[in-house]
Every structure is written in C-alpha cells, then in structure tokens.
Regions:
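A short, basic N-terminal segment
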Residues: 2-50
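A short helix-turn-beta junction within AAA+ P-loop NTPase domains corresponding to the substrate/partner-engaging
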Residues: 79, 155-168
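Helix-loop-helix "sensor" segment of P-loop NTPases
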Residues: 178-198
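A short helix-loop-helix "switch/interaction" segment in the helical subdomain of ASCE P-loop NTPases
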Residues: 196-210
Length: 216
C-alpha cells in the first residue's frame, strides 16, 4: 500500500507540473534546435564530449532551451548543479554556493556548475562576487540572459566567459515538439489528441517552446 501511495503521489505531482516541465529534455538526443551549438562537431557538443567545460553565457530569447541545455550539460558530465535566479538571489546566496563548492573540493568532487538565470539582472556587486570563483575554477558558471551581455554583464566577468547565441526555434522544430508532446507525454498520450491548429499555436508562441507547450 505504501509503495502504491508513493507512486500515486508521484503521478499527481507530475500531473500538476506544466507540460513544458514534463517534456523537458534530459539528453542532447531529445534536445530540440540550436544545432549550430549542439550538433555533431559543434562547439558545445565538443565541449561535452571532451568533459572539459569552461564558463559561458547563453544569450537568447525566452523558451529556446537555455536552462534545459545547462541542466543537460551538468547531467552528462555528472557535475553538481546549483541554480540561482538573479531575480530572487543576492550576494549572500552566491557566497553560500561558492563556500559549498570549496568544501566539496576536499572530497575530490568534480567542480560544480553554477547556473544563474537572468544573469543580466544581477547588480555589479553581485557579479563582482562571482569573479574569484570563476577565475580559480571553483565553479563553472553558466549564465542565461535575454539581453545583450556586452551591455549587461561587467567586463571582468564577461572576459572570463564565452558567449553563445541561441536562436528562436524554427517552425519545423516547434511542429516536432507538438507531435512529441502529444505522443510521449504520459497524460496527453492517453487522450487520442489530434492538433488541428498547429500554425496558429506556433504563431501565437512567437518561437517560444515553453509558451507553445503550455498553450497545448
């Protein structure tokens, strides 16, 4: 009975999650779009295959896979993964993560990845607090931003990071995303759904995959 209750609770928790979260890719094989970065022989694919990842910033519009890509990289490389949102985190939060990372080095733990969403919202002081840890390699920073990093990220931090541009999802990728969700999502796949308004949905989403899935 206890096992059944646990499984049932997990199903309810999953059902309560937005479709975009339920369909979040767990590997590059399921990742849609951005082939100029993750396709065979491309820069991020080579970085992952080599197991050596340097700090970088992902710049692109909403819903193009910035957070998902960071999560996949951490998973593929089996790195500890810390997430901070620039909207709700401060210098104290950054320092706490860095202290944890420094403590883990004594246990031969791989350098953690620190993912900062909306890094352009960090103040100069908040960005300054990252510099030493990034320079020493205490953490590998992956920042995500919808704004031009040249204007929003301080020069000393920007000089320590590569910047990779993510593009809006192409129509074919978004069509594939709809088909995959209908076929593979645990709940949608049981309802025999046929999507007749793909064009309208894709147009309304504006190339934002997250928005598209949540419309569905």
């Amino acid at each position: 009975n206890f096992e059944y209750l646990c499984v049932d609770r997990k199903k309810r928790n999953m059902e309560n999650k937005p479709l975009a979260e339920r369909m979040r890719p767990k590997s590059l094989e399921d990742y849609i779009g951005q082939q100029h970065l993750v396709g065979p022989g491309k820069v991020l694919r080579k970085m992952i295959d080599s197991g050596v990842v340097s700090s970088f910033i992902l710049w692109g519009p909403p819903g193009v896979g910035k957070t998902t890509l960071a999560m996949i990289i951490a998973e593929q490389l089996k790195r500890p993964f810390y997430v901070l949102s620039a909207v709700s985190s401060g210098v104290k939060d950054v320092r706490e993560v860095i202290q944890k990372a420094e403590g883990q080095r004594f246990f031969n733990t791989p350098n953690p990845i620190l993912f900062i969403d909306e890094i352009h919202r960090f103040s100069k002081a908040q960005q300054d607090s990252l510099l030493a840890a990034v320079e020493k390699g205490t953490v590998t920073l992956i920042g995500a931003t919808t704004e031009n990093p040249s204007f929003e990220v301080i020069s000393p931090l920007l000089s320590r990071c590569q910047v990779y541009v993510l593009k809006s999802q192409e129509k074919k990728d978004l069509e594939d995303l709809i088909d995959r969700a209908v076929a593979k999502d645990y709940y949608l796949s049981k309802r025999n759904i046929t999507v007749k308004e793909k064009e309208a949905m894709i147009s309304y989403s504006g190339g934002d995959a997250r928005k598209l899935l949540n419309i569905l």
